[in-house]
Amino acid sequence: MASGDDSPIFEDDESPPYSLEKMTDLVAVWEVALSDGVHKIEFEHGTTSGKRVVYVDGKEVIRKEWMFKLVGKETFCVGAAKTKATINIDAVSGFAYEYTLEINGKSLKKYMENRSKTTNTWVLHLDSEDFRVVLEKDTLDVWCNGKKMETAGEFVDDGTETHFNIGNHDCYIKAVSSGKRKEGIIHSLIVDNREIPEIVE
């Protein structure tokens, strides 16, 4: 089938709502963990057609056709907080290209390293459903499955507790001093009086 052919790919009624041409120029896929969830970024780069397409969580956010300059960058937003993301397209040799993702002006690796210092993440299973809880240490915002939670803070003898609910479940994040300068404050998620282990993203 020629690439410009508009004829259907399948003869029966079971054909998918997209053609096989969709995503044929897919060159890079990244997963980015933000407070509101893990986002999938896909990038198509047609080196012969000059096409550039960016998808975030399966939705097209940028489409450019007939770009004569094959190197450059595409900038867009990801997630509820509209986090700035940039895909850099660089020539490495001949017709080979390198694709790198920056989040808030940092390489993805550097961003994730910084993020692990500024957030805590827990994953738990309640009432037959999976939940991802994220604490942003700088703002003390709590996110659960992509939604910013309403919280109530309270001082206790050995630190603070930030209370919120997941469904009918009482939850709080307890913050206590580690007593060690390098470790700083230790945050623990307690759900129904049970501590949930933290995960590293």
UniProtKB/Swiss-Prot annotation:
InterPro entries in the record: FAIM1, FAIM1_dom_sf
Main location as per UniProt: cytoplasm
A biological process term (GO) from this entry: apoptotic process
GO CC aspect terms: cytoplasm
Annotated keywords: Apoptosis, Cytoplasm
Keyword Lyase (UniProt): no
A UniProt-annotated Pfam family: FAIM1
Subcellular location field: Cytoplasm
Function in brief: Plays a role as an inducible effector molecule that mediates Fas resistance produced by surface Ig engagement in B cells.
Family: Belongs to the FAIM1 family.
Protein name: Fas apoptotic inhibitory molecule 1
Species: Bos taurus (Bovine)
